[in-house]
Structure formats: structure tokens, C-alpha cells
UniProtKB/Swiss-Prot annotation:
Main location: host cell
Annotated organism of origin: Autographa californica nuclear polyhedrosis virus
Keyword Ribonucleoprotein appears in the UniProt entry: no
Entry keyword Cytoplasm: no
Keywords for this protein: Host nucleus, Virion
Record's protein name: Protein AC145
InterPro entries membership: Chitin-bd_dom, Chitin-bd_dom_sf
Length: 77
């Protein structure tokens, strides 16, 4: 059952025909190389930024615009 869940998750991250990088929806520090569905990770204290297709330093408070800051704001609402 767990394998079915993982396949559904990776099919949404790397849809058929998509080539490039895509952010992991559950882990701000991870991203995928599509179409191979290879999970990659940013270095410590960095998060993946889809707009620049690169890892950027994490801003841990509400002033940032990255994934971690967005999750931080959502937790405070």
C-alpha cells in the first residue's frame, strides 16, 4: 500500500513529459529532478526556490517569501 502512495506522489511531482526541477510539496529543503524522479536536497539552512531553480538561504520569520516563511506564516494564522 505504501508503494502505491509513493507512486501517486511522485507522478504528481513529475508529470509525464515534464523535464526540469520541481519543488517537493512537503519538504522545503528538497526538490526533484524530472522526469527521472530523483529527489535532491539543498545544503543545511537552505531551501529550494522554484522561481530561480536553486537553493536559497532560509528566512525563518514572517518577512521571508520562501517556502519555510510561508509555512511559518500559515502556522501562525
Amino acid at each position: 500500500m505504501n508503494q502505491i502512495h509513493l507512486k501517486c506522489h511522485s507522478d504528481k511531482i513529475c508529470p509525464k513529459g515534464y523535464f526540469g526541477l520541481n519543488a517537493d510539496p512537503y519538504d522545503c529543503t528538497a526538490y526533484y529532478l524530472c522526469p527521472h524522479k530523483v529527489q535532491m536536497f539543498c545544503e543545511l539552512n537552505h531551501e529550494f526556490d522554484l522561481d530561480s531553480a536553486s537553493c536559497k538561504p532560509i528566512v525563518y520569520d514572517h518577512t521571508g517569501s520562501g517556502c519555510t516563511a510561508r509555512m511559518y506564516r500559515n502556522l501562525l494564522l
